[in-house]
């Protein structure tokens, strides 16, 4: 059964149960904007205190001893471990301090600058995605890359009368025609002791391909910068920033920026992207742009300014056999479906106060092909 018809089928199957409820009325709660589905995301509600009682005040004198693994053998050593200073130190070992976390923006791209090394932030970032409702599909700690599996935003399902009454009884039958996934990159920041965290979104939507509406296929949809921004804001809160402070930081980054990139053509027809950024910032922005347009970074050499990438069809990634949108354009299609996609070299070069971006051939020369021009065009849309 295809997913677009699932709601209709569910309504028909339970219509007889609702005849007696026709006269019932009630208000529907405003759904959350983001509510991704996963089995591990369901949490047991906290115990509610009856109106005539008050919540007990916590007294650390009766707290269960922590198992920090230090194994204090004397009462004085044990008391030292249980002191407020010691507990504060243990807490900092679990969740890094990010009082200096901030949102930076260049063009239509945003990223989070947080205190701590990538290794120290890796665990909290992974926890964030799992708590948000995603399954982690790819983990490359050495490369600083983490990617979620495809998931649906349950908040986009219409909260109609039928679904509101039956609730979770038939909730699994309902689904949306959209899927989202996110890739996170953690890189050492330009300031020692900080990490730049980039979040890129990729989306798919399901469409009918037959007049009888009995077959569907998935198509890629554009990256959503606002959804990326919301995830950055939530991650900032998850890492320790106050809600109001994180919201204010994101609002401050909403100003419409000046165009930061332009395309030029040489006498030989080769294309070059000129980015009005220093190499450090241009390198990071190009990496995020590659994530957004569907490239997989197989390797990178910052000292040489090179990204080694391949294009990954999102439909294949979503376990569908149909060709994706970019594949239909024959931009990245290999000569044989059984062969792996061609590897491309994206070259970022420092040029005084700005940077340039080019596509290179395997021999190291500037690629003058139509494919190269289209790749630069895709990057320009992200970097301008």
Swiss-Prot record:
Cellular component GO terms, alphabetical: cell outer membrane
For the region Disordered, what residue ranges are annotated?
47-70, 251-273
Q: Name one GO biological process term.
A: protein insertion into membrane
> What start and end residues bound the annotated signal peptide?
1-23
Please report which positions carry a covalently bound lipid of kind S-diacylglycerol cysteine: 24
| Primary location class | membrane
Q: Can you say where in the cell this protein is located?
A: Cell outer membrane
Q: How does it sit in the membrane?
A: Lipid-anchor
Could you list the residues that carry lipid attachment of the N-palmitoyl cysteine kind.
24
Gene3D superfamilies for the chain: Outer membrane protein assembly factor BamC (3.30.310.170)
Q: InterPro entries from the xrefs?
A: BamC, BamC_C, NlpB/DapX
Report keywords, A-Z: Cell outer membrane, Lipoprotein, Membrane, Palmitate, Signal
Subunit record text: Part of the Bam complex.
Q: Which family does it belong to?
A: Belongs to the BamC family.
Briefly state the protein's biological role: Part of the outer membrane protein assembly complex, which is involved in assembly and insertion of beta-barrel proteins into the outer membrane.
* UniProt protein name: Outer membrane protein assembly factor BamC
The species this protein was found in: Accumulibacter regalis
Recite the lineage of the species.
Bacteria, Pseudomonadati, Pseudomonadota, Betaproteobacteria, Candidatus Accumulibacter
């Amino acid at each position: 059964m295809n997913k677009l018809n699932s709601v209709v089928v569910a309504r028909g199957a339970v219509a007889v149960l609702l005849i007696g409820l026709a006269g019932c009325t009630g208000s529907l709660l405003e759904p959350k904007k983001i509510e991704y589905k996963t089995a591990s995301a369901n949490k047991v509600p906290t115990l509610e205190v009856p109106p005539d009682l008050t919540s007990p005040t916590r007294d650390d004198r009766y707290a269960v001893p922590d198992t920090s693994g230090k194994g204090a053998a004397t009462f004085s050593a044990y008391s030292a471990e249980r002191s407020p200073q010691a507990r504060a130190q243990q807490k900092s070992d679990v969740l890094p301090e990010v009082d200096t976390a901030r949102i930076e923006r260049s063009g239509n791209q945003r990223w989070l600058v947080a205190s701590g090394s990538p290794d120290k932030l890796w665990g909290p970032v992974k926890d964030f995605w799992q708590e948000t409702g995603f399954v982690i599909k790819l983990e490359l700690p050495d490369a600083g890359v983490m990617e979620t599996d495809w998931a649906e935003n349950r908040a986009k399902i219409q909260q109609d009368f039928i679904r509101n009454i039956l609730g979770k009884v038939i909730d699994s039958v309902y689904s949306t025609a959209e899927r989202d996934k996110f890739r996170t990159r953690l890189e050492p920041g330009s300031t020692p002791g900080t990490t730049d965290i980039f979040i890129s979104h990729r989306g798919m939507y399901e469409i009918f391909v037959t007049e009888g509406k009995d077959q569907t296929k998935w198509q890629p949809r554009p990256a959503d910068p606002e959804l990326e921004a919301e995830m950055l804001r939530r991650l900032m809160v998850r890492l320790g920033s106050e809600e109001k402070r994180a919201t204010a930081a994101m609002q401050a980054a909403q100003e419409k920026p000046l165009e930061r990139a332009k395309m030029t053509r040489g006498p030989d027809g080769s294309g070059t992207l000129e980015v009005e950024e220093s190499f450090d910032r241009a390198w990071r922005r190009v990496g995020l742009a590659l994530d957004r347009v569907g490239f997989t970074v197989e390797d990178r050499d910052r000292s040489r300014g090179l990204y080694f990438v391949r294009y990954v069809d999102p439909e294949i990634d979503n376990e569908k056999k149909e060709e994706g949108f970019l594949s239909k354009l024959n931009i990245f299609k290999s000569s044989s479906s059984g062969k792996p996609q061609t590897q491309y070299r994206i070259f970022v070069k420092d040029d005084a106060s700005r940077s340039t971006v080019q596509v290179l051939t395997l021999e190291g020369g500037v690629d003058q092909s139509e494919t190269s021009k289209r790749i630069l065009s895709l990057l320009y849309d992200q970097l301008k």
